[in-house]
Amino acid sequence: MGLTAKLDKLKLKTTSEDIEDDSGHAKPDNSDDIDEVDSEYQNILLSIIAQLRPGMDLSKITLPTFILEKKSMLERITNFFQIPKLLIDSNSIEDPLDRFIGVLRWYLASWHISPKAVKKPLNPVLGEVFTCYWDELPNNKSAYYLSEQISHHPPKSSYFYIMPEEKIRVDGVVIPKSRFLGNSSAAIMEGCGYVTLGKWDNEVYVMNQPNVYVRGILFGKMRTELGDHMYVKCERNGLEANIEFKTKGFIYGTYDAIEGIIKDSETQKELFQISGKWNEVMYIKNIKTGKKEVLYDTRGSKTLKPKVRPLEEQWDFESRKLWKPTIAGLAKRNHELATEEKSKVENEQRIKAKKRLEDGVEFHPKFFREVNENDNGVKNLEYVIYKKFDLKEDPEVLRERLFTVAPIVPGQKFDEKFHYPAFKKPESN
């Protein structure tokens, strides 16, 4: 049986009966937490994997829909911004070392926000965009996010986040590279993020991501692990953190543990130790005094989900609208429908890619332009938002400038230049 036939077999089984409300509508909020890899699905997955070789790139392999999350990677990135109070609190701290610890706390706190079951976000198509906003932040503050898939092979997702009243911005790119490792698969998370605190004279924090592993593909129970090293660095204040996300050994060890240090970048003197579990309680210990306290307890964490414009106001290539039929199938656990709708989107993109190749047309992002010599300190991003955002400006000026990039809040209209390539648009109003 070929790979396509094995995937088609997934269409024969669907279990939507138990997840519909009285009106017949699917309940989408909890289906990502349902582990659907039963014995039949596991056998199908095993048949697919049997055709792979260790180290093989998985980016061109069509995975069965039962392991897909009901959101695009462009939306998944917003997990970083769903505990905004921690970032706001960090921005109010006078002491540079304590402020660094606050930013580290905010970043580490976000990793537990994920489906309970093993789920992979939908791969964004080239040119796909996602925008959202938060209008219920503390003290009536607001935040905005926009992202775009700037490359498909390899996949690259650029994003921009701004909290105008706090004068905080985050620029970043996520570059996942999937590999098959035998009983595991790995998403090697390349890319990085830059957090800029305008209140502190544009103090910048640079950070990367741990890698993501799915264990138990061939035998054992499937589960997700974060692994390897993550760093946070602030060159201005000469501080850095190196955090190891420990993976469980075959015999010894525990799941989800972290261990790391905060140190002085110049002297290499270790100042604090970090320990605990990234999805439970994390601790920080002052090496000089020996005092140990809770850095963050995820078990009491409250998240603020992003808000989006109504679907009828969205462009066809905005994530929620583009993947709506696929997400509907996933919500009902109707994998025949989900596979069919997902294939429609992907086939359309292949046709467009072929047409661009035949016509000699190069793709250019709408929101992000290539980094140039004037973009100090963000060379690793490759692309940045094309508009200039000076955090010293009034919050309302920053907000209105952002709204000229793309509609983000309900009621906004598309500008006539929306479809122009970013490099052809003016960086200021």
Curated annotation (Swiss-Prot):
Signal peptide: none annotated. The keyword Transport applies. GO terms for biological process: lipid transport; single-species biofilm formation on inanimate substrate. Keywords: Lipid transport, Lipid-binding, Transport. GO terms for molecular function: lipid binding. It comes from the Eukaryota. InterPro entries: OSBP_sf, Oxysterol-bd, Oxysterol-bd_CS. Pfam families: Oxysterol_BP (PF01237). PANTHER family: OXYSTEROL-BINDING PROTEIN (PTHR10972:SF102), OXYSTEROL-BINDING PROTEIN-RELATED (PTHR10972). Belongs to the OSBP family. The C.albicans mating-type-like (MTL) locus contains, in addition to the genes for the regulatory proteins (MTLA1, MTLA2, MTLALPHA1 and MTLALPHA2), a and alpha idiomorphs of a phosphatidylinositol kinase (PIKA and PIKALPHA), a poly(A) polymerase (PAPA and PAPALPHA) and an oxysterol binding protein-like protein (OBPA and OBPALPHA). OBPALPHA is not represented in the genomic sequence of strain SC5314 because that haploid assembly includes the mating type a allele of this locus. This is Oxysterol-binding protein-like protein OBPalpha. It comes from Candida albicans (strain SC5314 / ATCC MYA-2876). The gene is OBPALPHA.
